Each structure stands twice: as structure tokens, then as C-alpha cells.
Amino acid sequence: MDDFAEGGLSLADDILLEDYPYEDDCICTPDFTTDDYVRVTQLYYEGVGMQYKDYAQSEKNLEYDICNIWCSKPLSILQDYCDAIKLYIFWPLLFQHQHSSIISRLHPCVEAIRSRAAEISLKKLQHLELMEDIVDLAKKVANDSFLIEGLLKIGYKIENKILAMEDALNWIKYTGDVTILPKLGSVDNCWPMLSIFFTEYKYHITRVVTENCNLLEEFRRHSCMQCVKQGELMKMRGNEEFSKEKFEIAVIYYTRAIEYRPENHLLYGNRALCFLRMGQFRNALSDGKRAIVLKNTWPKGHYRYCDALCMLGEYDWALQANIKAQKLCKNDPEGIKDLIQQHVKLQKQIEDLQGRTSNKNPIKAFYESRAYIPRNSSAPAFRTSLNFVETERGFRKTKYKMANGGDQNQKVADEALKGDDCDCHPEFLPPPSQPPRHKGKQKSRNNESEKPSFNSEVSLQVDLKSILEKQFSKSSRAAHQDFANIMKMLRSLIQDGYTALLEQRCRSAAQAFTELLNGLDPQKIKQLNLAMINYVLVVYGLAVSLLGIGRPEELSEAENQFKRIIEHYPNEGLDCLAYCGIGKVYLKKNRFLEALNHFEKAKTLISRLPGILTWPTSNVIIEESKPEKVKVMLEKFVEECKFPPVPDAVCCYQKCRGYSKIQIYLTDPDFKGFIRISCCQYCKVEFHMNCWKKLKTTTFNDKIDKDFLQGICLTPDCEGIISKIIIYSSGGQVKCEFEHKVIKEKVPSRPVLKQKCSSLEKLRLKEDKKLKRKIQKQEAKKLAQERMEEDLRESNPPKNEEPEETSDSAQRCQFLDDRILQCIKQNADKIKSVVLNTSTLLKELLSWKVLSTEDYTTCFSSKNFVHEAVDYVIGHLIQEKNRVKTRIFLHVLSELKELDPKLAPWIQRLNSFGLDAIGPFFTRYGASLKELDFHVVTVLWDEKYGHKLGSIEGKQLDYFFEPASAMEARCLIWLLEEHRDKFPALHSALDEFFDIMDSRCTVLRKQDSDEMPFGCIKVKNKGKKKKPKDSKPMLVGSGAASVAPSSEAVTPEDHSRRNSDSAGPFAVPDHLRQDVEEFEALYDQHSSEYVVRNKKLWDINPKQKCSTLYDYFSQLLEEHGPLDMSDRMFSEEYEFFPEETRQILEKAGGLKSFLLGCPRFVVIDNCIALKKVASRLKKKRKKKNMKAKVEDISKTGEYLRVKLPLNPTAREFQPDVKSEALSEDVKSIPGPADSSTLAAEDLKAQLDSDSSSGSASEDSRLEVASPDSPTPLCEDASPSPTPAPEEAKPTYWAQSHLVTGFCTYLPFQGFGITQRPAYINMVPSLSQFTSIYTPLANISSEYPMQRSMPVVPSFVASNRADENAAAYFESPNLNTEHDSGDHMASETQILEDTLGVCVRSQGSAADADPALSEPEGNSEHSGSSDSLWEASLENVSGTTDAPAAPSVAIQVSRSMVHQEVNTEPYEPFETQQGDLSQKEKECHLLREQLKVACENCEQIELRSSQEIKDLEEKLQRHTEENKISKTELDWFLQDLDREIKKWQQEKKEIQERLKALKKKIKKVINTSEMSAQKNDGFDKECEPHPDQSLGFSSALTDEKTKAEESVRKGKELYEESHQRAVAAEVSVLENWKEREVCKLQGVASQSEAYLKSLKLMSSDSATYPDVEYDILSWESFLSTVREEIESKKSQFEEHIKAIKNGSRLSDLSSVQLSEVSFPGCSTIHPQFLSESSGHEDPGLVACVDSMTGAVLNDPYMDSASGCPEEVPELSLGSPTHQPEVTQQLELKGASQVSPSEQSPEADEKLSGQATRSSQSPKKPSNSIIEHLSVIFPCYTSTELAGFIKKVRNKTKNSFSGLTIEEIVEKVTEHIVDEQKKKKPNPGKDKKTSEAHSAASVAKSSQSPPLAAAGPSARTKGQKKDDVPAPDGNSCEICHEIFKSKNMRVLKCGHKFHKGCFKQWLKGQSTCPTCGSSDLLSEE
């Protein structure tokens, strides 16, 4: 497995790659499948399930219990169980062999599973998907006890051979999925599917419940660790093979990995991807389905499954599967993007294929469509969803492999993919091509006639191979490389554009999009694989960028771009965004009306959006394309346009053209400033600066702006003088201002004349009306009061006279929005006591689905089930606050038979409210209900109430309007309320039903004066001057308040009388008379109370002036908070003050000193603020500091309390005679020291008194009771005009008078108290004398108190509504959020020990109120010393001295409090009684606190007096109303004047227009007469012209004929020249072909000759041992040359065909001319050559000599540019087939490297060949000659011997001590020197060049293998111009690489350094390399 390679596959592996049959072997006959599952169930029943059988026989209701236990589990766990059961059901169908045993289900690694991929037919796949839909039903209703119980029953029947077909179909119907039943009907036999589903689910649910089996863990334990490791290893190898494009091998590895880990969905997904590449779409479909079943939330599995369906032609099926996948994978944002893209692609494919059919095989069509795509194409494919697939990946690029069955696989080139990693996450790709067919027109794939034959497949493959090979040319790669660069640039520009747009860099974005649009042609957009919508999105991006810039020019261009989208691209679906963009443009221009029109159009086009779009070539989503976001944005814009801001100015120029609007805003894009001209009559005339300049030029002769001062106002009919001119600059600032003060004469105001009644009859009518109104008001109040009392009596059930009801229970009641739920909560204990059968109630609530199965199980699991069930249900209702469930609970209560008769009428009365409200509701909203989709309502009804009230299928909405269907009608309203999100039009109607109709209540306005109107504040009496006081709403009971209809209708006679008697400047119309009277009465009332501008009142009462100013500034500071004296508010308001007010402020020394003269104002940080605001700020700071101190002290105190031992002998532990009484939340005031008791009579009188003075003060008092009466600790606080201090302020004040026993809603206004709902609670049944004061030690802790209080008065105001008395105080130092409950048990200790409250315990428990006795202590309330210290310190500022009472504090244990007083010592702090009360530290601390409290008492009194003043100031709020009414009157008069002036102006304008029109008519008449005369003259002149036109037309016709003739001749000439050009190009290509073929044939002939000579020499193997090896090399070389000849011929023929088809020679790619090198062979010994020269051809010897010395190059193969010689590329054959050529190339490359750069491997190869060529012993001279013959093949052995002799003579006949290499080097240098001395000879240039080149190589190579690997030598016929340099990048003289451009290139092509060439020219005048004398060169 480790060394896995091609050719090494085993037989088993080959079998895996075979073509699998189409027939599916996993779903066979239904009988067998059913038997398989029934056998599984029987096995369970015979073994493990036998106990369940026996138990089922003994217990009939076992399914119900199993169902309850199953449904009691969390929903998430149940859904996981359902997924596991689904795997168990599908395991035999998709993953396992048919005949596998039951053991293999539990141990997949033991038995062989179906790892081998099997195809699934489309019919079988339909059955599988239907089965999957049925199985998924159970997951939807996993926690529905009704349906799960039915499932278990059906499974039980099937297992017992009972036919339950009808039950099964009904079960599926009740689940609500209406799509499955038609599918089941289309299946021939659906019973096997249903039996499998119900039996398997019943089997597994029973296992989970009875055996406590965890299906998830059981499924995960199937694979052992070894299997997991092996599977992971196989997967990694498969990933590697996939990245290498070896998909067949990757399939084998993935298959083996699946054998080890069959539950891994990634493996099936990877294998499906491989099958897609291989073209095996059915196998891919099977694996995709398996991956989905294993994990249905994996997006890639769904993607590949849809791809396989698409490749099979099932486009609609694939689209439906994609929609289902998006719903399942909605929590995966990355995966959902790819699925959305696939969805768009499928939709477009279906649209493209509409109306077109094809009978081709889809795979064959796929090959044909992809045949002409080049293999190595790098052009990226653009995704349909506008996402560009990046081709620059870190992995190797892979290609698609497609096959038409079995192992006949064909590679089809496509875009490269990113290889899978360990878990194999390749990118999603669209299929490479789609067959042009549609699902509706295709036949079954199983049709054998459609399968192509094997011969057709072979021919198809051969054609495809030839086509692909033709495309693998250099030009093709270059073209696609250019395409890739273009797309890269495109992506870069788009990314720059949208990135800049997201970063608000609009100019950069506009630049990028503009550059992009300039380069894109919409007509050629498809050539870039882009859709037209991509181009439109680029246009949209440019428009948005220009819009963001916001300048006028850019806005106009943006508007044009948006209009371009609408006009030219309406089919792309972006009209909505375009209209929205135009609206934004107009909104930027502040043209709100035009913007509103476009926004409205955009709202209507939201549905046309194509979906969520992304920027082209990216994954970045365009946020505006989200429909929900567009909708919200448009609604916001529409709201802004409907209510535009007030313009800063309005241009009055009649010819204003400022962006088609006269409104001037500072935010206008073209805003350039404006001018405002004001006159003394308060006229304001404004102009654009451009309009003002035009007006001055045309009307005022360019008058200077300043000269307009003191001129006449520009307003028509205004006689005022211009007094002020303000010019605003383009920045909105005041540029310059001119002002001239005009003293306006004060005209006395015209007195208001009241119309007096002219007759006594009218006076009598008025008095009668007043009397009637008063009587009606009193009757309405009385009626409302009676109904309120009646309803409250009904809402309060009969009481069982239980005086022990605790007052703390009232404090637990919170105010709820639902009044029915509030009533149930208040009477929870009564309801609990009357419900006798709790189990029946719970079952009914469970059936009505008020309680879930989990809640029902929780109730039953409780030990105290009977007593706590009702409490649990009510608490559950309060927690959910569901109005429907509350009323269902009330309905169930009313239907119970076993109910206490005392409470039954009350419950039935509450329940009947809803039934009574049905009629009015349907009468009012019947039309809206009839517009509903009743089919949807029917489905919802069957789901919710079908099992209780029956189905309403077949009925109409009119059925609910019948009186007999009141219950069903109410249930219908309940159903609409529960699904109100689906019926948005009924929200208000449903709220009205539940808030008003169903829970009857009336909100009345409580008036302090009985003479004021009751319903609303409407003043109809002119003479009534008294202002009504602030109304206080009062919540009363059931019933609707009705006011008697007013009988004020005026008869027509009265109207006539009024009209006749009316006096005044004008008569008021009848329809306005009543409104005018009301307005005048209201105005007279306000003006009579506060006359601001009445000088007499100002002079009479100067204090009232100051008081009014103080009120005004108080209101200003209340609205805006503390303000700086330099604030703009003061300066602006001061400008409008009258002169008298300014004088008052100037006398006081300014505004600041004036305000400080009033105690209401203070200065804080140079800001004026109200004193009460300052006190709040100080208290907040003080509170923060105090809390910090409390925390520190509490920590220290806790440490001292716990860690430090107490000293019992200390002085502080002695009993203290005077104990301080403190309350945590209520402060006490000093009282007489000798008053130790208070009589009950005084107490009663104090309670009954209505006075706010006397004994009741603003602070609560602490009293000490007599020993024989209950100890009063705190007296109830009565209302006072001064507010309570913040430290001990009651949240709601108690009323001083008694009220009846009902709940009243009293929001308190004023007094600085937070306004929250308050309720006056009272217990009428309790005595006022026995329950007012409660002993502190006996306060019950059953209900946790909201505040730590030592007293619970019986009658106070609180925010709790109950029939019992309760007190609720709020202190700012306590956090109300932590009120409930964890410190109640410690409150007694805190109050006794820490605060020192003196408590006199009762003698026995009987003396105390039994209802207040404390039950068993709660352990969770165990002590808190932190709360002790905190409570003691929070009220430091609020404590005062209290009268002392001699007592001994007693420590009470927490566990003993509820029984009686515990007098035992408390260990370990107490050894005897009273020790703990003498704590040293606490007493000292309390004394300090008392001192501080006494010192702060005076400050508190001052503060309270200040607050009293604040309350008095609040009574003067009518000043504000006076100002408002006066302002409104002024506005009314101004509007009237403005309208009159406007009418007058319009009248003048109309008259002027009329005059202008008359003048214009006269002018038109005159001009018409003149034009008629001119026309007569023109007619006379034009009469001869028609004759002349005939001559012109004939001349033009002749010219046209000549032009057409010349065009025809030109076309003929063009055709002839084109044919000649084609013939010429064809002849050129034929000549090139002949030349190349001749070259190769020459090489072939030479090779044949040499091969022939080698064969002749093969007889003498001793002399030439390697002759056989050389013969084989030359034969291989000869065959290669012949193949190359054929290849060149075919290439030239293709080019000739292309030329004939219309292509141009310049556009075609040139034929690659590869150089052919002879193979390297061993050198023939000179002896052999000399011996054979006598009987061999001399030419042959020369040929052999030249070929063995160097590689032969044909002269025709040399390039014309003289480029340096390189190693030739061989395009024929592969390295494995031609080892000789590879060896030759390696040796040649090694020989061209310097000795220092040669590698050891090259040396080894060279030395190896040298040893092979020199195996026989040789003489040194022969070896030297042999070396030299290789270097200088042009010299004979005799000539070389002569050179050796010359060198020996120079060295004085001594070669001793020199090696052969050194001798060869010296001889080589001598030969080169000899050649340089000779003159250049054209006939010998070749030999000189060869010698020089050979010498250079010899110098650079010192090793013996030079004999076998010398440099390339030229043939004798080679030209000197074609001799290349050794290296094109190095100097020919010094052989150094050119590092700069300082070089010289000769005409012959050789290159030299300029310095080297200058040195050479000093002694020579020829080319150093070729000896050319032509030295003309080019730089």
C-alpha cells in the first residue's frame, strides 16, 4: 500500500474500477426489505424485548408512559436521536449488503459493509427520497406526545401482524406535511416503506426508554481505534492521488478508507467528487446521497449530489434538491453562498434549455461540447453567481476526467481545482459542461438502446485525442496566459472599487470603476466568461461612488448612470436599485418630492430583485441587494421625504432656477449662499445669491447691498422700511450684516369686543345647556362608580374569612398588562383552594397544550404534587404572559365539575367576558377576517384545536359568525393571536379584543372639581375662566362608561336666529360656529388668567412679573437641563423679551443675578440649574461614596465579627439603658422623652384625620406601644405638601381618607416622585386597631419583603394590587432589583442588632397575629453580615433620635423564629442572655451614626422647605399654556394676514398676466399677417425650383451608377488579390515543408550510411567492442527522425488547410523546428581507421571521424539570427524510450560547465564512458592522438603527430613528468596559435572556427572523458555567418557573462566586451571567433 503506483494494481483493485451495473442492488423487492426489518424487530422481541412484551400485556397504557418519558427529554437530544435512528434505517439500504446479519449493524468493522460504490437508478432514488421525507417527519414532531404515542401504537400493530395502513396514512396527514401523501399514492406499493418506518422508530424509541440506551454513543462506538487510524491513512493517500489527478487510484483509496470508517461522510463526498471527474455520474449520485444521509447539514455533500443530478439531465430535480439543501444548511454562511450560486446557475441553465430538445447521450454531448478546449488552458471560468474561481492556488492544478462507462476514461481539460487536504475540502465548481437537454424531453438512462457501442467510443476517443494534441501549441498557451492576465487585472480593479466603496473612499472607487468601464465592451462581455449582470453591477458601483462624492457634477453623472441601467438593461432585475439610487440623488439635492416618487417606484420593484448579489469576481455581498435591507432602507427614505425639514430660506425670485426648487437648504450641493432682507414690519425676503444678482442687474441697476437699507420693503403691499440685511456665505456662516434700527410706533391694541346676547331667550338656552352638562357629568360619574364597584366585587371571589392572610402576599403581586392574568394572580390562593381534582386539571391543560410534556412531567415528579400543581401552573402562566394560554386556563377551570361552588360563579363570569365579546368583534372586524386565506387558517386549526374541537375543513368563515359557534369563534381568535406574525393586518384588532373587549375595564379621568367635564377637556362656556386641574386617570372595574348624549342640537330656527342676530365684522359660518366658540372660550380663559402684555397688570403687580419670569426660566431649565450663561438659548430668548422685561433684568444687574435672587436657581460649575437638580446630583455622588464606604466597612466588620474574639468584660458589653430605635427605610423625628405609649384612641383619630398638618409630618414617626397592646414601631405616613427626603421617601403615599375595598390606580404627579402605577390596598375584614402595628419578630418570611421595614401598616399606597394591606417604601440607597428574597430571614436580626430597634417580644405566639407567624426557616436565607453592615450604614444621613424604651435585646436563632421567641444563649458568642446585644464595636458605631443624624436634621428641614417651594411653583403651570395659546393666536392671525396678502398678490399677478397675454395676442396677430405676406413672396420665388431639381436628380443618379460600378470592380480586384495571396502563402508553406523534410531526410540518409558502416564493422568486435550498442542507438535515432518527418508534414498540412479556410499566415503559430542531434557513440580507434582505409570508402571514414568527435548539426537547421548554440530540445519520444539521447544531452551539458562547477555525478558519468571507450591497452602517443582527433577532427593523425613533434621540440624533447592531459593541452595551445598566425581563408574558416571552439572547450575541461563528449562540430559546408558563440550571454574573448549593456555585437552575430574587442583590434582586424573581415556592427 505504501508503494502504490501505476501498473501495480491487484485484481481486486481492477474490479473496483470496473463499470458497475445500473441496476441497484441495495433496494430490491419490497418483500425482502420488509422481511429484513421485521426479522430485526423479531430478534429484538425474542431476546431483549421479551420483557417489554410481557409488560405490554400487563400494562395497556405502556405506550403512553413511554411517550411521556421520551417527550420529557430536551428537544435537541430528541432530534439527535432521530438522526441516529435515520442512520439505522438507511444503513441496510445504502451502506450494507443485503444478507448482512444483525450483528453487522452494531459492528461494521466485523462484517464487510458496502464500501464498493453502487449506482442507484433514478426510480430507486425517488423511493429513497420519499423514504427520507417520511423519516424526517418524526424529527419534526419529536416532542409532540400525541403524535409520538400514535407512532408507537402503529408500530406495535405492525409488529403483531395487524394491518394499520389507514392509521399510518392518518398519522402522516396529522403531521401537517401535505406533500408526502401524493408521493405515496404514486408508488405502487408504499406499505413496505411505512412498515419499515414505524417498526424501526418504535423499536429504537422503546430501547431508549426501557434500556436507557444512548443511540449516539452506540453508533460512535462501532469503529475501533485501529480502524479509525487506518481509515485516516487511506483518506490522506486518496487526497494525495486526487491532487495528482489520478482519480481512479484515489477512488480505490477512498473505498478502502470507507471499509474502515463507513460512518465518515467526508469519504463519500470525496469519492463522489472523483466520480464526477471520471464521468461516472451515477456512482457520484450514490455517494452524494450517502454523504447527505450521514450528515444532512454538510453543504458540499448537497452540492455534489445536485451536480450529479444536473450531469444526468435532471435539472428540475437538482433545483429542488438545492432548495432543500439551503434550508438544511442555513446555519453555514460559507456553504450557503455556494448553494445559492449553484441555484442561480441551475435556474439559468433551465431557462437556456427551454424549448430545445436533444436525443444525444448526455456524456457524449458533454465530450463534444468540451472537445475544443485546450488541455493546459489557464483561462479561469467565471461562476454563474458572479464569483471568480482563483487559479493561483498552492496546490497542483488538476483537470477533469470524464468517462463513458467502465475503465474507458478520457481526460477532458478544464479549469484547475484546488486539491483536497486531509478532510478533502475542494472548492465547489460548476460542472464543466451541461448537455443541451431538458428533463421533460429526456428518456430513461436505463434504456439500453441509448448506450453507445464500444466502436463509437474508441473512435470518439481517437478524434478527441487528435484534436487536443493539435491545441497544445505555444500560441495557445500564450493566448490563454494573456486571458489570465486580463482577468487578473479585472479582478484587481473590481476589488479596488468595492473596497474603496466600503471604506467611504468614493473618489478612489469612482476612479477604479471608471477605468474598468472604459476597458469593458458590453457587446463582448461574454468573451470574458462574464454575464451581462456583471457589467451592470460595475455601472451601479460607479453610480454609487459618484453619489457618495456628492458634488453637483457627480450627482448629475450618477443620475445618468442609474437611468442608463433602467433604460438599457431592464432585464437584469436591478431597476429597484436604480430607482433607489435616483431617489438618493434627489435626496442629496433636497428635492424631496421627486425623491419620494422614485422611492415609491423602487418599493414596488423589490420583488424583481434577482436575489442576494455579490460584486463580480468576488464573494463580497452587495448589502443593497438584500430584499429585507432594501425594504427597511426605502421605508426610512420615504419617511424622511414625507416629512422634510423646514428650509433655511425660500427664494422669492420669480424666475428662480435653483435646481428646480425655490427652497434653500444649507446642505444643498450647489449652495452658494443667500441673502435675507428684513423690514420693520417683520417681513423676511430671501434670495439665492445668483437670483439676487440677477434681480439687482435687471431691476435695481446693480445697486450696492448696503444701499437697500432704509428703503421700501420688497414685499408687495408692505409699507415697511428695510431695517436689516444678512448675507450668508457658501459655508452657511454670516458673511456680512447691515442693520438700521427703526423705532416702531406703538399702536394701542384693539380691545376685544365680546358679542353680547341680544335676547333673553339665548341667555336662557345657555343656562339650560350648562345645567344639562352638569347633570350629565354627575350621572356619568355615578354610573361609572357603580360599575366599578360591581366589577370589583365580581373580580374578588368570596372570602373564607381568613384573617391570618399575610400582608406580604400583596407585595408579591406585580402589575401585569393582561388584566385577566392579573386577576388570576391576585386570587391564586383562592383558586388553589377550590381546585379539588388536580390531575384532571393538568390533563386538560396538557391536551389544550397549555402545558408541555416536560412541564407535565415536572409536576408529576414533585413530591407535593397535589398542593403545588396549581401554583406551578399559575406561575407558568405568569412567566410566559401568554394571553391565549391564560384564557384557556380560565376556560378549563370553568369546565371543571369538581369545583368549589363559592368560586365557580366568579370564574364563569370571567370566562364569559370573552364569549360576550365575540359578537362585537366579528361585527367590527368581519370584513378583515373574510379577507384571510381560510385554507391556511384550516391547517393551523387542525394542528392546534383539531383534536379537541374537530376539524373545520369544508367550512367557511361564516360558520363562526353564528351564535351557536361562539366557542369555536373564540378559539379562532385565540388561533389568530397565537399566529399573529402571519396576520399583520389584525394586530390592532387582536389587541383591542384582548385588552378591551375580553377584559372589561374603563379608564376615567378623575377630576378634583365636580364642575369640570368628565370625558375630555373641551371648553364650551365662554364665561368660564377657571382652568381645569391636571387630570388623574383612575382604573376602575369592568363595564364601559357611557355618557348621556348631549341634547345640544340646534334647530334650524336657532340657526336662523343666530344668523340674523349676529353682529360683528363678519358672520361665522354654521359649521364653524361651535369650533370658534370653543376657541374663543379657551383663549379668553387663558388671557384672563395671565395677561402678559397688559401694561396695567404689569404696573399693578410687579412681583407677578418676576414670578412669571422665574416660572419661564424654570420651565426652560427643566426642558434643557443646566445651561451656561453664555448659552445660545438665553441670547435667543432675550431678543424676544419686551422692553419692560428687559428693564427688570437690567435693574437686577443682569440675567444671572436676577435668577440667583430666587432660591429655585443655583450655580453649578458656571451653569445655571434648578436647585432640585443640583440636590439630586449631590445625592447621587453621596450615594456612590456611601456605597463604597459600606463595602469597606462591611468587609472589616465581617472580619471583626468572625475572626476577632469579643471581650465580655469590656465596658461596651454592659447593658445600655437607652436604646436607639432606627428604621432602615423610615426616619423618625425627635419626640418627647416621657411619651412611652400611645393610646389607641389617639391612633385611630390620627388615622381618620384628613388634615396634612398636626401630628403627621413629612417624616414617619417611631412610636413605642404599651406592653398590653401590639408594639407599634412605625406610623403610617400621611400626605404632606412637602416631599419626603430622598433617603426615606415612600414610593407611593398613603391616602389620608378611607376608601372602599377595591383596587384603585393612582399615578401621583409632582412631589419629585417617580410616577409608577400605585394601588391603594385595604383589608376590610381586619380591625384597624389590631393590624396596624405588627411585632417585628413575628413578620412572616414566607414571602420576601421588597424592603427591610420594621412595620407593615394596614392601609398605605403601594405598587401592588391586592385585597390585603401592604406597605412598600423605596429608598434611593437600596437597589430595587435585589428586593426579592435572599435577606428576609436576616431582616429581624438586622433591625434588632444593627439598627438598634427596640422590640418588645410577645409573651406567647397567641398574642401575635397567626397569619404573621413565620414558617420553617429557609436555609438559603442564612445569615448575612454584609447586609447587616450595609443596612446600618445606608441610612446614616436619615437617622434621628427616637424615644427610648427600656428593653433587653434578645438574640433569636434563625431556625427558631417561626415558632416562638428563643431565649437560649446563642453559641459561641453568648454565654448568658443579653451578651450579644452588648457588642463593643456595633454600639460605638451606632452612637456615631446618631450624632451624625442629629447634625443633619436641620439640613433635612431646609431641604424639605425648598421642596415645598418647588411644589408651589409647579402649581403655576398655566403660564405655559397661556403662552402657547397666545402664540397659537398670533400664528393664526399671521397666517390669516399671509393668506390675504397672498390672495392680493395672486390677484395682481393674474391681472398683470392678463394684460401681458392681451399684448401678446396683438403681437401674434401682427406677426401672423406679416408671415402670410412673406409666404406669398416665398411661393412666387419657389415656383421655378422644382424644374431645377429634376436636372439635379438625373445628375445624381448618373454619379450613383458610376460609384456602384467602381465598387463592384474593386470587389472583384480584392477577390483576385485575396486568391493570389492565399496561393502565395500556400506555396510558402509548401516550400518550408519541402525544406524541412529535405533537412530531415538528409540527416536520415547520413544516419543510414553510418549505420551501414557500423554493421560492416560489427564483425570485428574485439577492435570495436561497443558496436552493437551504437547500432541500436543509431537505429533508434533513425526511427525518431522518420517520426519527426511525419510530424512536420502533418503540421505543415494543418497550416495549409487553415490558410485555405481563411486564416492568415501571420496569425498562425509558427511550426516548432526542433534540432536533431546524433547519438553519442564510442570513438573508433585510429588504428582501425587506418587499417580499413585501404578497402573502405574514404568519405565514410571522414564521416565516421566527424560524427564521433562531435554532435552533427545540419546547416539548414541553424537559426538565422546567429543565436548561441544550446542543448536542442527533443519533442519526439520520451526520456524513458530514448535513454541514449538523454545520456548524450547530459554529457554535453556537463562538458560545457567549468571544472569548478561540475558536479560529482557528471564526473562519474564521464569517467564511466571514458573507461568504456578505452578498455583495451593503448600507447601514450596513441592516446594523445586520439584526444586531439576528438578536439580537432579536421586534422588527420599524421598532421596531429607533426604538431606533437613540434611541441616536443619546443620543450626540448622532454615530455617526462607530464600527464596525457597536460600534453594534450600544450599541443592544443600550439595548434590554436598556428591557426591565428595564418591569414583568414574563406575555404578554411570552418576548420579555424572548429579548432578555436574545440580549443576553448579543451581548456575548460581537464578530464579524459572529452573524447566521448566534445563540443558540437560543424560540417564542412557550414557558412561562417551561422557560427554561433558558445554562450549568447558571455564575451567570446574573455568568456565572462555580460553584466551591463557595455558590449559590442558584430554583423556576424558574435558579442564582445567593448574593452576586450578594442584590445583585439590593436593587433587584428578580423572577428576573433569566425575570422570575418566585415567589422560593421550595431550596438
From Swiss-Prot:
It is found in: Nucleus; Cytoplasm; Golgi apparatus. TPR repeats lie at residues 231-264, 266-298, 536-572, 576-609. The keyword Nuclease does not apply. It catalyses: S-ubiquitinyl-[E2 ubiquitin-conjugating enzyme]-L-cysteine + [acceptor protein]-L-lysine = [E2 ubiquitin-conjugating enzyme]-L-cysteine + N(6)-ubiquitinyl-[acceptor protein]-L-lysine. A zinc finger (RING-type) spans 1931-1971. It is an enzyme of class 2 (transferase). Residues 1788-1799, 1808-1821 have a biased composition (Polar residues). GO terms for biological process: negative regulation of axon extension; negative regulation of neuron differentiation; protein K48-linked ubiquitination; ubiquitin-dependent protein catabolic process. The keyword Transferase applies. SUPFAM superfamilies: RING/U-box, TPR-like. InterPro entries: DEATH-like_dom_sf (IPR011029), TPR-like_helical_dom_sf (IPR011990), TPR_rpt (IPR019734), TTC3/DZIP3-like_helical (IPR056872), TTC3/DZIP3/RBM44-like_helical (IPR056870), TTC3/DZIP3_dom (IPR043866), wHTH_TTC3 (IPR056871), Znf_RING (IPR001841). Phosphorylation on Ser-378 by Akt is required for ubiquitin ligase activity. Proteolytically cleaved into differently sized N- and C-terminal fragments. One of its GO terms (cellular component) is nucleus. GO terms for molecular function: ubiquitin-protein transferase activity; zinc ion binding. Gene3D superfamilies: Death Domain, Fas, Tetratricopeptide repeat domain, Zinc/RING finger domain, C3HC4 (zinc finger). Keywords: Cytoplasm, Golgi apparatus, Metal-binding, Nucleus, Phosphoprotein, Repeat, TPR repeat, Transferase, Ubl conjugation pathway, Zinc, Zinc-finger. Residues 1214-1227, 1576-1586, 1873-1890 have a biased composition (Basic and acidic residues). Its EC number is 2.3.2.27. Interacts (when phosphorylated on Ser-378) with AKT1, AKT2 and AKT3 (when phosphorylated). Interacts with CIT. Interacts with POLG. Interacts with HSP70. Interacts with SMURF2. PANTHER family: E3 UBIQUITIN-PROTEIN LIGASE TTC3 (PTHR17550:SF4). E3 ubiquitin-protein ligase which catalyzes the formation of 'Lys-48'-polyubiquitin chains. Mediates the ubiquitination and subsequent degradation of phosphorylated Akt (AKT1, AKT2 and AKT3) in the nucleus. Acts as a terminal regulator of Akt signaling after activation; its phosphorylation by Akt, which is a prerequisite for ubiquitin ligase activity, suggests the existence of a regulation mechanism required to control Akt levels after activation. This is E3 ubiquitin-protein ligase TTC3.
